[in-house]
């Protein structure tokens, strides 16, 4: 981070499948003046205890965060839905460095964003905002799957091979680019 001198750092979970353009999230982050922005979405409350569940105020500022709570809080006005973290975190670089160094000094910490860092900075009323991947207030639906279990991985794989997949890997407006370096055999 010191060498690159980037202003922002985007941290992504490796066990999720979704399609997202991060530019609107970065724009939201910059306009809100947030130190940290968390990608969020709503899911049925019965499934929410598998994720980090959060509460927001009217300005989308995160006011509470609990990692995998036994009794998740519903979204106000939507008693059967909960707001969860997608494992997408956008940090101002200096905030990330400060909080990771600070957390490293805490012996009882598990050094986990959802268990330790986010709850602490939210409790301290730092500038942490929620960026909705899909807006429950507008009944938007977008494809996002956690594939952290074998069953979830299988179900997501089956989603992709359906006749009309929710996430179309052949969408010409969303090309998949990769770089395969020329390596010796």
Task: List PLM regions with ranges.
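Active-site acidic Asp-centered loop
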Residues: 12-13
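Short aromatic/hydrophobic "clamp" motif used to bind/position activated sugar donors
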Residues: 9
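Conserved core of the sugar-phosphate nucleotidyltransferase
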Residues: 19-94, 98
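Left-handed beta-helix
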Residues: 94, 98, 102-185
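Glycine-rich phosphate-binding loop signature in dinucleotide/nucleotide-binding domains
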Residues: 1-6
């Amino acid at each position: 981070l010191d060498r690159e001198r980037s202003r922002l750092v985007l941290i992504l979970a490796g066990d999720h499948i979704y399609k997202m353009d991060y530019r609107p999230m970065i724009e939201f982050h910059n306009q809100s003046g947030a130190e940290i922005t968390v990608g969020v979405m709503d899911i049925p409350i019965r499934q929410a205890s598998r994720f980090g569940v959060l509460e927001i105020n009217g300005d989308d500022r995160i006011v509470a965060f609990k990692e995998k709570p036994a009794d998740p809080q519903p979204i106000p006005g939507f008693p059967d839905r909960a707001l969860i973290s997608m494992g997408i975190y956008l940090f101002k670089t200096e905030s990330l460095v400060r909080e990771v160094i600070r957390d490293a000094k805490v012996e009882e910490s598990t050094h986990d964003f959802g268990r330790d860092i986010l709850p602490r900075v939210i409790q301290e009323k730092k500038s942490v905002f929620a960026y909705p991947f899909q807006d429950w207030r507008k009944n938007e639906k977008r494809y996002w799957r956690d594939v952290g279990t074998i069953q979830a991985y299988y179900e997501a794989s089956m989603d992709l091979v359906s006749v009309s997949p929710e996430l179309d890997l052949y969408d010409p407006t969303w090309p998949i680019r990769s770089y395969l370096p020329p390596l010796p055999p």
